[in-house]
Amino acid sequence: MSMFCYQCQETAGGKGCTVRGVCGKNEEVAKLQDLLLYTVKGISYIVTKGNIDAAKLGNTNHEVLSSLFMTITNVNFDDGSIEKQIRKMLAVRDEMKKSVQAEGLHDAAVFSVDSRESMLKKADSVGVLSTQNEDIRSLREMITYGVKGMAAYAEHAKNIGKEDKEIYSFIYEALAATLDDSLSVDDLFALTLKTGEYGVKVMALLDEANTSRFGNPEITEVNIGVRKNPAILVSGHDLTDLEQLLEQTKGTGVDVYTHGEMLPAHYYPAFKKYDNFVGNYGNAWWKQVEEFESFHGPILFTTNCIVPPRSEEVRRRIFTTGSAGFPGCKHIEADENGKKDFSEIIELAKTLPAPDEIETGSIVGGFAHNQVMALADKVVEAVKSGAVKKFFVMAGCDGRMKSRSYYTEFAQNLPKDTVILTAGCAKYRYNKLGLGDIGGIPRVLDAGQCNDSYSLAVIALKLKEVFGLDDINKLPIAFNIAWYEQKAVIVLLALLYLGVKNIHLGPTLPGFLSPNVAKVLVEKFGIAGIGTVEDDIKLFMS
């Protein structure tokens, strides 16, 4: 049986990748990821069946987060590291199994494999299509993808020292439920919304972790040009990795630039003390093939999004860490205290040319909830006076599809009395357009990374309170969200849990939504796709 994966927005034909992932993963990697996920579901089943307290599982919780993170789109393409993780998690599962009644356990809790060949054979029977009913399958996958996004955010918070036992408990509960054939469509819909509830909790946890460690994001002008020093490019999302690299590059003559979703690191006060933290290089993740060539220096991937490099020269400059991985790229492990030695990257940087300049100027961001609340009086007055007619939440992800030019055109054609609220790499479609300001309020307010969509929800709820409204949907806020991978799924489910309706989701609706599940989302929540820029703006402004 060939691979089957439809977890990302770019899945082939909007239906599923069956030969090779559009992301670049091959059949073997896809199947190993399926088996790793199934193994984690087996652990979740044992935890749930045995009423095991997640608070007592310590490192097992961390390995579960890492395993789930490894299966997110564009995180890990390294078949060897995924196989190693499967073996590790099977050992964890088998040890845990000793504490529960052995009879009648689900296959996920008892299956065994002893070779790569047997792993791939087993994966054939446990992938997405092993659930026959398409509506049950659709809901199970939506919950699973939401949990993957939740695990990514929980791992980042854990790396900063913030954990929540309730989030671990829910991850086990939700994944175990995807193995339970007694659950109905209604049961799974309820669990989908509960996944959104825990999505809000995990984003709040990560927000607390980031701000307690690095300070509250503040309005910041970020340089997009270059200097003449050798440099390292940091991509992904993990701020603790960036912090360690900046500490280790102090005084070395090596500059550090952010890439993609790491851009918002510049907004945190703690990172402003590093004089070699120069700026942001390039654009959204999918443009990296060309931009990595012109950067010249080493690239450190702390998480997704990795695009398979097309040349050996670039591959030799790519390093991975955490849950990320790519064959042939050096992986930097943490020691038992979470410390990482980046000296090899730094020494390589010293031997390579400085980056080529691909653009000049600066961009402004740092509009997370604390900063926007500090401007609340100005924002409220702008709404009351009519200077600002509407806010557009255009958070989410960017991607390769040509149809994503819609978001650039949408931003360009919005009436001048509207403001865009954004988070995630979707911002790159319009954050360099120079859309101006309204009475000193920039027309693009960037809150940060994809998880900082939490900030946008906090801002909306605060505005609801300020204006004395009983429903978030009565605010002059429209949601036009771009999605790509599983972290966007947990953000979407969180918004649905908070009661947000009439979200437009694009550039295409998820391939994992069955017609019946999509129908319920449309009828109950008003979820819609995108149309033409002109028609959508008319609809939103009416």
Swiss-Prot record:
Hybrid [4Fe-2O-2S] cluster binds at residues 237, 261, 305, 397, 425, 450, 485, 487. InterPro entries: HCP/CODH, Hydroxylam_reduct, Prismane-like_a/b-sand, Prismane-like_sf, Prismane_a-bundle. Its cofactor is [4Fe-4S] cluster; hybrid [4Fe-2O-2S] cluster. GO terms for biological process: response to hydrogen peroxide. This is Hydroxylamine reductase. It comes from the Bacteria. The keyword NADP does not apply. Pfam families: Prismane. [4Fe-4S] cluster binds at residues 5, 8, 17, 23. One of its GO terms (molecular function) is metal ion binding. The keyword NAD does not apply. GO terms for cellular component: cytoplasm. Belongs to the HCP family. It is found in: Cytoplasm. Its EC number is 1.7.99.1. Keywords: 4Fe-4S, Cytoplasm, Iron, Iron-sulfur, Metal-binding, Oxidoreductase. Disulfide bonds: none annotated. The modification Cysteine persulfide is found at residue 397. Its main location: cytoplasm. Binds 1 [4Fe-4S] cluster. Binds 1 hybrid [4Fe-2O-2S] cluster. It is an enzyme of class 1 (oxidoreductase). It catalyses: A + NH4(+) + H2O = hydroxylamine + AH2 + H(+). Catalyzes the reduction of hydroxylamine to form NH(3) and H(2)O.
